[in-house]
């Protein structure tokens, strides 16, 4: 263990820092890093270099080269830069490369050098050009801040949802600030800049002068500033060689350190971790690296090559032409286990396990010592935690063996932490491999989450590894394997070296009916790449018509979309396609398409009935559908025309159509309606009142109610209304008028074709029993009992029923007998029944 701590460097009394190698870089750099614009993404992300930068005087006519490497130095992309001069490079949280040009344009490239999009930082930049730029990260996304030639700042907090904010002007600013950076206070981005001895804080509305708490006097300029990874802390390098460290609000000072070096550093970044004992700042000059904190002494390293610093959540990555290293504060668990002469439970357990492997009795002694102190659980937990922070697999295994050894002597130690750590380390070791080149630490991995890591593997097209990780961790299929296969299929759809049929077949063979995979999404990606036929073939595998149809419409394959919509049976989907076709095709082609699709034609007719009547008429005319055309004109006569002449003309057109359809009944009925309309208009003119649009029966009834009996009878004769129906109409009308005298005359005018029971019923309906009794006596024998019961003459009804010897009538009368009043009648009926049964 003494040898293991050889690269530990103390910073003060409470913390150690160590630097270890991540990779030996094999990239073939033809120039020094200092001659390039450099950008490295956090969380073990890729490195971008723009060679032959414009700031170099030589070879100004040679196009620069943009190169992208993995963290291990493996090339990912290389492309000639054909656009304007670049001021700054930076990576977004989604690992997209942002290239900020002098003209304010920001070009966005993918990890493999594929151009994604571009946007502008405003019109002001066109006149004043960009002097400097920063790419920063907030919880909203990745942002860009620029300094223009007019010494004004503009920023966007989220390039995914571009909203430019022009920051307030700094009073008296006549030259570029000596240094500046972006801060994030209360989820709002700010800009902190230094002008001579003064610091200014800009938000979207104000410019405020600020002073760091406890800053040593004598400062005439700030040369460098750095904000921590989480935006909580700030470091300022002054021209006096002092580094002020404090909170980002500048209200609280952590410490101040004298570097005894007044030359401005190339880079200055924070090096800390969550729950850090000793937060530190790493400062890099040409050949010197210094780690300073709240301690009288600093840690210093010699840099053999030009190096670049990448701040991380829990440390700093340092890469050069030949190496890629990681500098961080030694975690507490590792420090307690490996510190010289440590008697921590984890240290004793590790020694016990080693002695056990040697078959030494010292193993028992160490174990007993831990158990006597009651610290065995703590020892196991320390070893598990320390294993997560170790980079070398051999040391990970040693610590996990020690933890496993200690667990054997515990009755109820929950295994989850041990199992999860083993799983996490297997994943981390896999992605740290040189050929993968993602050197995540355990802390970064937990912050990033497994889903984001899988997304980054997919972004690198490392599909097999991503699937292996999903299967190993047993992630739900929709979140894991299915999602990755969908990404693979989208990538495969862009492969131009294969025929459309082969690509579609390969994708289907791999995906099958995998849950969570949408063939329409893959087809959309293929269409976006210009492979329309491949997209159509892929849509054949999409089981959901609702996903097929919109894309087919987008691809201008409307007729195929209509067929798919009809197959689905979804009428809303069919209507969507029909409306699209209507706007896309000329009228003749549209109608011809409908004729070949009966279901679509039927649905469109339904639509036209409510929305487009003229189109409906055209459809009927084109199909020579005279029956429906006649019905259309009948509806139109009532819906649109108010003048009687127009309505009659429309009805005449309808009658002609019915004749053509050989529907004589409908034609005659239509002609009768025309005749009725003319009569109704004449009645209105002669008699007044409302007759138009009444039915024939209502017209007759209205005439009777108005006392125009002769006109009613004439109308009945004209339209051949049967006598029975006319008597019913007149009976109802006279009863409504309560004209009982006229009703009696009407009943005696001739023999009633409907009998006289209706007279009884309608009189009783009008609550006139007196009149009803007049007609009850005239009712025929077969309905006599019912009529007598209606007028309440139960005794007479009983006499008639007994006389008829009709069992049904006897039962009916008996059901109307109530209480003691009708008791004698009921007895009489019962005796009559008994006599009838004897016979």
UniProtKB/Swiss-Prot annotation:
One of its GO terms (cellular component) is clathrin-coated vesicle. It is a peripheral membrane protein. The modification 3'-nitrotyrosine is found at residue 4. Keywords: Autophagy, Cytoplasmic vesicle, Endosome, Lysosome, Membrane, Nitration, Protein transport, Transport. Its main location: membrane. Signal peptide: none annotated. It is found in: Late endosome membrane; Lysosome membrane; Early endosome; Cytoplasmic vesicle, Clathrin-coated vesicle. Changing residue 52 to K: Down-regulation of VPS16 expression in mice; mice exhibited obvious abnormality in the behavior and significantly impaired motor function. GO terms for molecular function: actin binding. Pfam families: Vps16_C, Vps16_N. Coiled coil: none annotated. The keyword Membrane applies. Residues 642-736 are annotated as: Interaction with VPS33A. One of its GO terms (biological process) is vacuole organization. Plays a role in vesicle-mediated protein trafficking to lysosomal compartments including the endocytic membrane transport and autophagic pathways. Believed to act as a core component of the putative HOPS and CORVET endosomal tethering complexes which are proposed to be involved in the Rab5-to-Rab7 endosome conversion probably implicating MON1A/B, and via binding SNAREs and SNARE complexes to mediate tethering and docking events during SNARE-mediated membrane fusion. Belongs to the VPS16 family. Core component of at least two putative endosomal tethering complexes, the homotypic fusion and vacuole protein sorting (HOPS) complex and the class C core vacuole/endosome tethering (CORVET) complex. Their common core is composed of the class C Vps proteins VPS11, VPS16, VPS18 and VPS33A, which in HOPS further associates with VPS39 and VPS41 and in CORVET with VPS8 and TGFBRAP1. Interacts with RAB5C. Interacts with STX17, MON1B. Associates with adapter protein complex 3 (AP-3) and clathrin:AP-3 complexes. This is Vacuolar protein sorting-associated protein 16 homolog. The lineage of its organism: Eukaryota, Metazoa, Chordata, Craniata, Vertebrata. The gene is Vps16.
């Amino acid at each position: 263990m003494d040898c293991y701590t050889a690269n530990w460097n103390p910073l003060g009394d409470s913390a150690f820092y160590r630097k270890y190698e991540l990779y030996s870089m094999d990239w073939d750099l033809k120039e020094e890093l200092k001659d390039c614009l450099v950008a490295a993404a956090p969380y073990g992300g890729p490195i971008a270099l723009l060679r032959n930068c414009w700031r170099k005087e030589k070879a100004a006519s040679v196009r620069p080269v943009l190169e992208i490497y993995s963290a291990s130095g493996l090339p990912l992309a290389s492309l000639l830069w054909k656009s304007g001069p670049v001021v700054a490079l930076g990576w977004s949280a989604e690992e997209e490369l942002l290239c900020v040009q002098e003209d304010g344009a920001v070009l966005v490239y993918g990890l493999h050098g594929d151009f994604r999009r571009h946007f502008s930082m405003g019109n002001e930049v066109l006149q004043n050009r960009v002097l400097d730029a920063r790419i920063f990260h907030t919880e909203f996304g990745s942002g860009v801040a620029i300094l223009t030639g007019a010494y004004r700042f503009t920023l966007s907090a989220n390039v995914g949802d571009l909203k430019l904010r022009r920051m307030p002007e700094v009073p008296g600013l006549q030259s570029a600030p000596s240094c500046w950076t972006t801060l994030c206070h209360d989820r709002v981005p700010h800009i902190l800049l230094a002008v001579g001895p003064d610091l200014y804080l800009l938000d979207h509305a104000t410019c405020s002068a600020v002073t760091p708490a406890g800053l040593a006097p004598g400062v005439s300029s700030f040369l460098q500033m750095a904000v921590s990874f989480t935006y909580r802390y700030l470091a300022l390098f002054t021209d006096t060689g002092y580094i002020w460290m404090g909170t980002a609000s500048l209200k609280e000072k952590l410490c101040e350190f004298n570097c005894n070096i007044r030359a401005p550093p190339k880079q200055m970044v924070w090096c800390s971790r969550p729950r850090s004992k000793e937060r530190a700042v790493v400062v890099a000059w040409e050949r010197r690296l210094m780690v300073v904190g709240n301690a009288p002494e600093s840690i210093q390293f010699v840099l053999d090559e030009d190096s670049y610093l990448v701040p991380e959540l829990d440390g700093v990555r340092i890469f050069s032409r030949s190496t890629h290293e990681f500098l961080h504060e030694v975690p507490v668990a590792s420090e307690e286990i490996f510190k010289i002469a440590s008697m921590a439970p984890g240290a004793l357990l590790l020694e016990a396990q080693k002695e056990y492997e040697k078959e030494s009795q010292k193993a028992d002694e160490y174990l007993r010592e831990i158990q006597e102190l009651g610290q065995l659980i703590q020892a196991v937990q320390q070893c598990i935690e320390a294993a997560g922070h170790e980079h070398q697999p051999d040391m990970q295994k040693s610590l996990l063996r020690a933890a496993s050894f200690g667990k054997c002597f515990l009755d109820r130690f929950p295994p989850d932490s041990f199992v999860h750590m083993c799983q996490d380390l297997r994943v981390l070791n896999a992605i740290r491999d040189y050929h993968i080149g993602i050197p995540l630490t355990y802390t970064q991995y937990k912050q990033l989450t497994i889903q984001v890591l899988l997304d980054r593997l997919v972004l690198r097209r490392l599909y097999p590894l991503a699937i292996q990780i999903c299967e190993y961790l047993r992630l739900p299929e929709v979140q894991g394997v299915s999602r990755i296969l969908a990404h693979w299929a989208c990538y495969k759809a862009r492969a131009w070296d294969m025929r459309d049929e082969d690509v579609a077949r390969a994708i289907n063979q791999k995906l099958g009916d995998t849950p969570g995979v949408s063939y329409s999404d893959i087809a959309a990606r293929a269409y976006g790449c210009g492979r329309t036929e491949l997209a159509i073939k892929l849509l054949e595998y999409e089981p959901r018509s609702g996903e097929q149809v919109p894309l087919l419409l987008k691809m201008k394959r409307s007729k195929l979309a209509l067929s798919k919509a009809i197959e689905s049976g979804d009428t809303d989907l069919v209507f969507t396609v029909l409306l699209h076709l209507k706007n896309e095709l000329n009228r003749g082609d549209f109608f011809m398409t409908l004729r070949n699709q009966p279901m679509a034609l039927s649905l469109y007719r339904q639509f036209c009935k409510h929305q487009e009547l003229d189109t409906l008429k055209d459809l009927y005319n084109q199909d020579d559908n005279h029956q429906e055309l006649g019905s259309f004109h009948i509806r139109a006569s009532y819906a649109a025309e108010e003048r009687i002449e127009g309505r009659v003309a429309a009805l005449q057109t309808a009658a002609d159509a019915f004749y053509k359809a050989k529907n004589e009944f409908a034609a005659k009925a239509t002609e009768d309606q025309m005749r009725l309309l003319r009569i109704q208009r004449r009645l209105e003119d002669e008699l007044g009142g409302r007759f138009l649009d009444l039915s024939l029966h209502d017209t007759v009834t209205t005439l009777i109610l108005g006392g125009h009996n002769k006109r009613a009878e004439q109308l009945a004769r004209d339209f051949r209304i049967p006598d029975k129906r006319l008597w019913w109409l007149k009976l109802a009308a006279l009863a409504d008028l309560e004209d009982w005298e006229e009703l009696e005359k009407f009943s005696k005018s001739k023999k009633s074709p409907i009998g006289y029971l209706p007279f009884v019923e309608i009189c009783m309906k009008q609550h006139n029993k007196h009149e009803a009794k007049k007609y009850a006596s005239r009712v025929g024998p077969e309905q006599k009992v019912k009529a007598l019961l209606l007028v309440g003459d139960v005794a007479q009804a009983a006499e008639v029923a007994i006389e008829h010897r009709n069992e049904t009538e006897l039962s009916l009368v008996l059901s109307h007998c109530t209480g003691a009043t009708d008791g004698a009648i009921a007895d009489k009926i019962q005796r009559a029944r008994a006599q009838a049964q004897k016979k």
